[in-house]
């Protein structure tokens, strides 16, 4: 429907069967004004075919239905017929609105909304715009009407003073409904007075101090004008309190609850003026002047009392008189209550202090009675303080009047001493509006003599822990006394930091208690700590400083907080912490919108509006790093969603690594809440004496560290933090395979806290993997944390004694107020004219650091050294040279940068597990496997590829059955030993678990690709630096060109020429070598199938320069194997030597020759096409190629767009030499396809070539059902999301599915999914197809991204010859089957076959699915009628009883059925022409066939033409 630029503007009328009369009037009116050439009348069907916004004007009669929604989604300009008639009548232009316009009833109306919820506001906006009106979110002079949900907002007050109509949302709804019914033509046709906003809408009014008549009048008028009257004052419900006089209980509560306290005049003026008045004008307040004279004529006793200085007061104390600081007493004014005149007559309402002034203060009153006590109680309640009726250790302040002996006894006995102050401190705090330092108001009876408050070590706890007033104190420096009373100082000498640390630890502790069953609950000192560096505060805070300075320059200055969901004690602690860092606390109810709501880790209900909801973990992290951290940078900073009532991790024992600080504490709590047991040490076996359980999971951030290595060694899952969060979210144990830390990209740290100033909560420190930049915390793992010491010299000495390099962490920013207070550092006032050089006696310091828990803290995190020497020395040596760089999963270009790579070992991709039956040899066999590059497992798991077992053919051993069901290789121990002796990856089928070397045939002459793929080095060139590129021709699966490890990373022009010459030379060498091998094969007496000859012709030996390995690990037993392993590395065989030259010349034994032929045919390819074949180690993945280069999937798409696809033989094309000009940009680790598409496509964009409507319709209905194979888990997740976003579906099965239409594979493998897709003629695509779909935003054409197309194979230099055959075969079958389907014949690759399967049961289902995918009919059972109908019999008698096999084959041969090996199925698909069936005939069937056709047996014999297996009718 697109039009040319010269085409004029079109008006399209959408015609339907129920068009109204107005529709036809509009059509006639436009016809009178404009030519019919510019008018179009379209139907609903034509409208649905529109695929883009063609800038036309659409006239729709109904603003609902499928057609309207379709045009609206395309962004078309839509108006109703009433708009056309209105514009014609008034000679106006049709409005150019981005939204549909139904009529013009509100054409000159501009609306703004206030006090409406989001859904209601959006509904009002939609209706106004559809009726031709305009909408402004802000109130300005253009607004004509205000739509209000309730009164009292700023918009409401401004609009009311400007005399603008303030209406209800129902006015808009009524206009829309009446316009639909064609009852109105203008908004003025509806009476606005009926929809005027009531004066007190949304107000809940309560009164106090009014008489009965006035109260009754207020109640009636409130209900009449839309308000609600309430007799009782209720918190969070009442909005206004009408006050006669500003006093009374209701008034006090209303002020505390932020209820508007207004006079009665406010009520009457609101009714008189017609709108709710501003409450601030009518605020009920007390007079400023306070009554200082009693109401009665009788004077009080204290009114005439004289003030005395403390020097004039005689007081006897039990404190040593020599410790009295006379200077302090002489300069201090009276603190006694005698100076507080008229406390009984004090008017509390005169104070204008904030309602949360005393928040966090727990106050005990003593020595007061009567009206004084009542006044102080009311004062404390109005300030938000907590009053205690009994004196205990939770009290932070004691306000004393008369002397109280109970307080004195508590003071002398308790180690926790609250501030004992007079009532004047409380009154002056209310007068100034903030908490004043208590030191100046401490009662003389309860003040330690001679020790300034700032210098008391023990008092730091009280100062910081209780009121947070330490940083606000106006401290007076005093001379420190040389000697004091020993008994008194003993109370303060305990410099135990745990008292200080306990507070923030309690604040961090979530509200849910510890779960039972936890193996090890984290101790208190492993929670969030405040460092002992806080002691320095007393020495740097000797300046008199105003409170406002601290509040303005603190961490949380100008930030408001709302604390919800915590217990009273924890809430008080958190409030103190926030206030200490200049934050403001918002109490409920309040109209202030807090910046942050601090809630527990598991969250709580937040029913008020706040900026962001954060957890206490975020709060502690901000304090640790002294900066405001982004709450979105870590999922623990916001409430974690947890399914309640379930504990999915009850049987799990979890250990954490690389998690420190508040993050670790939160994760430990979360794990305990989910039922898991958390323990510090990561152990494999339980130890009841030490209270340790066997670990089941390790949660780690990065795949490094001793715990991670132990997890890999023990085959325990090492997952990231996301696993724990996902388990909490879904309420069941998440799949660990999706969250393995190995699968996560290195550059992506999901839970790493990103700090703006560069301080990270998890810095990467290789020397100290557990080091963490935090101030208030000790490490939980490291027994002796060097980073806790400030002295670099001290840390250096400790490092030398521990045998480590003195690696110092980055400079840390301590949590102190010095930067904001602009104070000098301690070094400046310790001594101004001397350089401070501390010296340490390291011996004494280290001895002092020893604690009773040191022994338990120094437990080894790994196995004993003796065990490592005995079992793992070879493993360490093998792993030390292993290349750990992870390759991209995408095809990569040839580049000039060549990385040095160690020679790969024979069993690099193998994971072995030794049966418990061979437990005595397990350590020895594991060592042999590790020396060959294989990994080993102590217990069988899903990662094992080879199970080493020795037993009978049909053994009933449980381990054997499990391994057999998994489909892994079950081999004899001799296979591993022979691999070590030959230093080759020998075929597994030659060494079954029943293998007995004394009863086995000599099969050294039978070699397939893996035998020749020897890792033993061959010296092709003696030059190490300047020689030509080495030729590396792998076996039947590898055809890659390796380059010299010492080659220059950049290729200039001459380098390219040399490369081309070397490449040509290498090809010639390979060709000559293949000819030699063919001659050798033809000369031998062994009968080989053509497929085997092809395999042997491709075989070659790996050539690379190497040197013998040094020092193998010492092992007991089988030294012959290790000695042979060393000698095999030094041996340099001749390239031109035939494989059988080293054998003795013997006579030709026909039976032995036949057995060798049978074994050689088994070596050709594994006969199991099921999903387990993906684990076959003989399939060499492209990652093994040493010349792997990065390539972009987008480059493949670009190449595919400009390549004319022409079928050609892959063997005729020469490999492309490396191109230096190609950009060497590495590909990302994983495809970034997780983000949803910006605009989901409505339909695919039109193709370049012209298509008929029928083709387009068929294209739209094309199904996209995907399956994936040989992709890693992250790619599967990302691609699944992309496919679903594009409208396709994904089948996540491990086996093939007939409903699949597209198969996306990483690399072609001879497995069930790939072969079944090939047999069914389905699309077999490269992963770059999905990347191209993501770029285009739709499913694109598949031809250029199909495996086998030149655009894919040319861009993938490391595709082996075997993979290339598979790719070309898939494309060939797809074209054949599609051509037959287009001609009306629905067939597959096996159409016409009627097959019977005689294979072992675990593999039968895979073969059945494969045959059925290709159109074959699989017959079950073997009755004689079925044998008559069947055409093929596929047998694999290795695991079946020989007697049954012979009987069955005899019956099948009698019915002239073709009895073939299962390998025939895969080769039938792969080869261009059908393979010869005789080469795959079962040997037993051949014997019966010969007997049957012998002389004297006149039975029917097939002609040679009939002996060939039928080819299906697919051309």
Swiss-Prot record:
Alphabetical list of InterPro entries matching this protein: BRCT_dom, BRCT_dom_sf, BRCT_TopBP1_rpt8, TopBP1-like_BRCT0, TopBP1_BRCT_1
One GO CC annotation: BRCA1-B complex
GO molecular function: chromatin-protein adaptor activity; DNA binding; identical protein binding; phosphorylation-dependent protein binding; protein serine/threonine kinase activator activity
Subcellular location: Nucleus; Chromosome; Cytoplasm, Cytoskeleton, Microtubule organizing center, Centrosome; Cytoplasm, Cytoskeleton, Spindle pole
Free-text tissue specificity from the UniProt record: Highly expressed in testis.
Stretches with biased composition (Low complexity): 1097-1116
Keyword Ribonucleoprotein in annotation: no
Segments of this protein annotated with the region Interaction with CIP2A: 759-893
Record's keyword terms, sorted: Chromosome, Cytoplasm, Cytoskeleton, DNA damage, DNA repair, DNA-binding, Nucleus, Phosphoprotein, Repeat, Ubl conjugation
Pfam families noted in UniProt: BRCT, BRCT_TopB1_SLF1, PTCB-BRCT, TopBP1_BRCT0
PTMs per UniProt: Phosphorylated on serine and threonine residues in response to X-ray irradiation.
Single GO biological process annotation from the record: DNA damage response
Domain BRCT: 101-189, 195-284, 353-443, 551-636, 644-741, 902-993, 1255-1347
Record's compositionally biased regions (Pro residues): 1217-1229
Keyword Nucleus recorded: yes
UniProt motif (Nuclear localization signal) ranges: 1510-1513
Comment text on domains: Some BRCT domains specifically recognize and bind phosphoserine/phosphothreonine marks on proteins. BRCT domains 1 and 2 bind phosphorylated MDC1 and RAD9A. BRCT domain 2 binds phosphorylated HTATSF1 and TP53BP1. BRCT domains 7 and 8 bind phosphorylated ATR, POLQ and RAD51.
Family statement: Belongs to the TOPBP1 family.
PANTHER family: DNA REPLICATION REGULATOR DPB11-RELATED, DNA TOPOISOMERASE 2-BINDING PROTEIN 1
Name used for this protein in its record: DNA topoisomerase 2-binding protein 1
Highest classification ranks of the organism: Eukaryota, Metazoa, Chordata, Craniata, Vertebrata
Gene coding for it: Topbp1
């Amino acid at each position: 429907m697109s039009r040319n630029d010269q085409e004029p503007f079109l008006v399209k009328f959408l015609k339907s069967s129920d068009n109204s009369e107005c529709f036809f009037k509009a059509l006639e009116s436009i016809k009178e004004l404009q030519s019919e050439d510019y008018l179009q009348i379209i139907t609903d069907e034509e409208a649905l075919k529109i695929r883009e916004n063609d800038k036309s004007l659409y006239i729709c009669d109904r603003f609902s239905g499928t057609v309207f929604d379709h045009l609206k989604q395309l962004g078309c300009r839509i108006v109703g017929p009433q708009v056309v008639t209105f514009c014609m009548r008034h000679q106006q232009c049709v409005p150019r609105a981005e939204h549909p316009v139904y009529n013009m009833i509100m054409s000159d109306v501009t609306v703004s909304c206030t006090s409406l919820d989001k859904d209601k506001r959006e509904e009002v906006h939609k209706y106004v715009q559809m009726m031709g009106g305009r909408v402004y979110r802000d109130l300005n002079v253009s607004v004509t009407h205000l739509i209000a949900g309730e009164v009292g907002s700023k918009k409401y007050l401004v609009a009311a003073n400007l005399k603008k109509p303030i209406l209800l949302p129902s006015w808009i709804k009524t206009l829309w409904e009446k316009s639909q019914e064609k009852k109105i033509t203008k908004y003025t046709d509806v009476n606005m007075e009926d929809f005027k906003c009531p004066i007190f809408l949304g107000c809940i009014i309560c009164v106090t101090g009014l008489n009965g008549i006035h109260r009754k009048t207020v109640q009636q008028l409130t209900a009449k004008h839309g308000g609600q009257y309430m007799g009782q004052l209720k918190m969070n419900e009442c909005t206004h309190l009408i006050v006669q006089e500003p006093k009374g209980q209701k008034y006090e509560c209303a002020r505390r609850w932020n209820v508007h306290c207004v006079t009665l005049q406010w009520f009457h003026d609101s009714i008189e003026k017609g709108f709710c008045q501003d409450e601030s004008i009518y605020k009920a307040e007390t007079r400023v002047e306070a009554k200082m004279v009693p109401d009665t004529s009788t004077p009080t006793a204290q009114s005439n009392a004289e003030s005395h200085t403390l020097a004039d007061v005689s007081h006897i104390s039990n404190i040593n008189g020599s410790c009295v600081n006379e200077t302090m007493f002489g300069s201090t004014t009276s603190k006694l209550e005698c100076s507080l005149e008229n406390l009984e007559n004090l008017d509390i309402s005169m104070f204008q202090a904030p309602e949360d002034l005393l928040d966090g203060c727990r106050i005990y009153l003593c020595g007061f009675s009567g009206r004084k006590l009542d006044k102080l109680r009311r004062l404390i309640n109005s300030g938000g303080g907590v009053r205690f009726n009994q004196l205990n250790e939770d009290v932070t302040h004691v306000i004393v009047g008369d002397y109280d002996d109970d307080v004195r006894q508590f003071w002398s006995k308790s180690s926790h001493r609250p501030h004992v102050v007079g009532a004047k401190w409380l009154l002056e705090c209310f007068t100034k509006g903030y908490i004043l330092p208590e030191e100046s108001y401490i009662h003389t009876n309860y003040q330690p003599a001679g020790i300034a408050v700032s210098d008391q070590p023990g008092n730091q706890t009280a100062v910081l822990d209780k009121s947070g007033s330490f940083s606000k104190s106006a401290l007076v420096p005093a001379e420190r006394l040389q000697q004091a009373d020993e008994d008194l100082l003993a109370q303060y000498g305990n410099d135990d930091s745990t008292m200080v640390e306990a507070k923030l630890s309690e604040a961090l502790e979530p509200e849910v208690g510890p779960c039972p069953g936890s193996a090890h609950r984290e101790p208190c000192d492993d929670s969030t700590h405040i460092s002992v560096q806080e002691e320095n505060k007393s020495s740097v805070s000797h300046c008199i400083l105003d409170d406002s300075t601290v509040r303005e320059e603190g961490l949380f200055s100008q930030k408001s907080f709302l604390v919800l969901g915590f217990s009273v004690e924890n809430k008080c602690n958190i409030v103190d912490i926030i206030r200490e860092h200049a934050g403001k606390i918002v109490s409920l109810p309040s109209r202030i919108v807090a910046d942050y709501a601090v809630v527990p880790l598991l969250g709580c209900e937040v029913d008020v509006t706040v900026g962001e909801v954060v957890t206490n973990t975020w709060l502690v992290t901000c304090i640790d790093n002294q900066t405001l951290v982004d709450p979105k940078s870590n999922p623990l900073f916001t409430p974690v969603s947890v399914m309640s009532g379930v504990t999915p991790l009850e049987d799990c024992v979890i250990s954490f690594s690389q998690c420190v600080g508040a993050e670790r504490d939160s994760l430990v709590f979360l794990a305990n809440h989910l039922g898991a047991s958390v323990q510090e040490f990561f152990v494999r076996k339980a130890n009841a004496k030490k209270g340790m359980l066997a670990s089941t999971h390790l949660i780690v951030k990065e795949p490094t560290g001793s715990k991670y290595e132990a997890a890999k060694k023990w085959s325990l899952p090492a997952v990231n933090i996301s696993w724990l969060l996902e388990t909490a979210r879904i309420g069941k144990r998440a799949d660990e395979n999706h969250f393995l830390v190995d699968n996560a990209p290195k550059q992506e740290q999901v839970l790493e806290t990103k700090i703006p100033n560069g301080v990270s909560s998890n810095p990467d420190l290789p020397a100290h993997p557990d080091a963490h930049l935090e101030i208030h915390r000790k490490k939980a793992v490291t027994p002796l944390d060097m980073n806790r010491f400030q002295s670099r010299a001290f840390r250096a000495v400790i490092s030398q004694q521990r045998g480590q390099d003195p690696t110092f962490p980055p400079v840390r920013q301590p949590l102190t107020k010095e930067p904001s207070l602009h104070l000098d550092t301690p070094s400046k006032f310790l001594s101004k004219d001397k350089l401070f050089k501390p010296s340490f006696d390291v011996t004494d310091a280290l001895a002092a650091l020893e604690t009773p828990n040191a022994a338990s803290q120094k437990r080894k995190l790994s196995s004993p050294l003796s065990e490592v020497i005995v079992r793992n020395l070879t493993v360490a040596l093998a792993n030390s040279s292993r290349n750990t760089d992870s390759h991209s999963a995408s095809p990569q270009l040839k580049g000039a940068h060549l990385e040095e790579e160690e020679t790969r070992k024979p069993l690099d991709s193998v994971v072995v597990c030794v049966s418990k039956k061979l437990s005595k040899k397990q350590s020895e066999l594991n060592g042999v496997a590790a020396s060959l590059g294989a990994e080993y497992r102590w217990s069988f798991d899903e990662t094992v590829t080879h199970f080493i077992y020795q037993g009978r053919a049909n053994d009933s051993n449980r381990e054997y059955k499990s391994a057999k069901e998994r489909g892994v290789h079950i081999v004899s121990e001799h296979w591993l030993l022979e691999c070590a002796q030959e230093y080759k990856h020998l075929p597994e089928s030659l060494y079954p678990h029943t293998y007995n070397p004394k009863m086995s045939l000599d099969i050294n002459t039978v070699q397939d690709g893996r035998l020749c793929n020897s890792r033993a080095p061959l010296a092709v060139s003696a030059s190490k630096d300047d020689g030509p590129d080495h030729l590396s021709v792998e076996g039947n699966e590898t055809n890659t060109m390796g380059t010299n490890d010492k080659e220059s990373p950049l290729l200039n022009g001459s380098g390219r020429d040399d490369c081309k010459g070397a490449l040509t030379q290498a090809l010639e060498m390979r060709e000559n070598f293949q000819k030699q091998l063919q001659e050798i094969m033809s000369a031998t007496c062994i009968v080989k199938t053509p497929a085997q000859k092809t395999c042997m012709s491709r075989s070659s030996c790996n050539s690379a320069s190497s040197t013998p390995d040094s020092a193998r690990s010492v092992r007991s037993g089988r030294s012959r194997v290790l000695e042979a392993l060393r000698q095999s590395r030094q041996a340099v065989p001749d390239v031109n030597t035939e494989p059988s030259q080293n054998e003795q010349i013997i006579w030709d034994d026909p039976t032995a020759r036949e057995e060798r032929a049978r074994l050689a045919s088994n070596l050709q390819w594994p006969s199991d096409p099921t999903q387990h074949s993906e684990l076959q180690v003989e399939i060499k993945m492209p990652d093994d190629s040493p010349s792997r280069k990065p390539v972009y999937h987008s480059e493949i798409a670009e190449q595919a767009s400009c390549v004319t696809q022409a079928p050609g033989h892959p063997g005729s094309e020469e490999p492309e030499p490396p191109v230096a000009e190609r950009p060497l940009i590495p590909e990302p680790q994983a495809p970034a396809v997780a983000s949803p598409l910006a605009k989901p496509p409505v339909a695919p964009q039109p193709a370049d070539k012209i298509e008929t409507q029928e083709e387009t319709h068929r294209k739209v209905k094309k199904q996209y059902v995907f399956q994936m194979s040989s992709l890693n888990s992250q790619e599967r997740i990302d691609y699944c999301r992309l496919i679903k976003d594009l409208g396709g579906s994904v089948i996540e099965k491990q086996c093939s599915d007939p409903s699949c239409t597209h198969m996306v594979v990483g690399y072609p493998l001879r497995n069930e999914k790939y072969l079944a897709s090939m047999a069914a003629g389905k699309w077999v695509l490269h992963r770059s197809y999905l990347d191209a779909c993501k770029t285009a935003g739709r499913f694109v054409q598949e031809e250029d991204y199909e495996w086998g197309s030149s655009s894919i194979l040319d861009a993938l230099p490391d595709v082996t010859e075997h993979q290339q055959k598979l790719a070309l075969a898939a494309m060939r079958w797809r074209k054949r089957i599609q051509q037959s389907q287009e001609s009306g014949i629905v067939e597959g690759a096996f159409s016409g076959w009627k097959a019977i399967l005689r294979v072992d049961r675990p593999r039968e289902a895979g073969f059945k699915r494969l045959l059925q995918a290709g159109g074959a009919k699989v017959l079950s059972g073997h009755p004689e009628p079925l044998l008559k109908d069947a055409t093929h019999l596929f047998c694999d008698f290795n695991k079946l009883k020989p007697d049954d096999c012979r009987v069955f084959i005899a019956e099948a041969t009698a019915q002239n059925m073709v009895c073939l090996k299962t390998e025939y199925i895969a080769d039938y698909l792969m080869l261009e022409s059908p393979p010869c069936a005789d080469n795959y005939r079962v040997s037993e069937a051949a014997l019966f066939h010969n007997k049957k056709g012998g002389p004297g047996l006149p039975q029917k014999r097939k002609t040679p033409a009939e002996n060939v297996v039928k080819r299906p009718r697919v051309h």
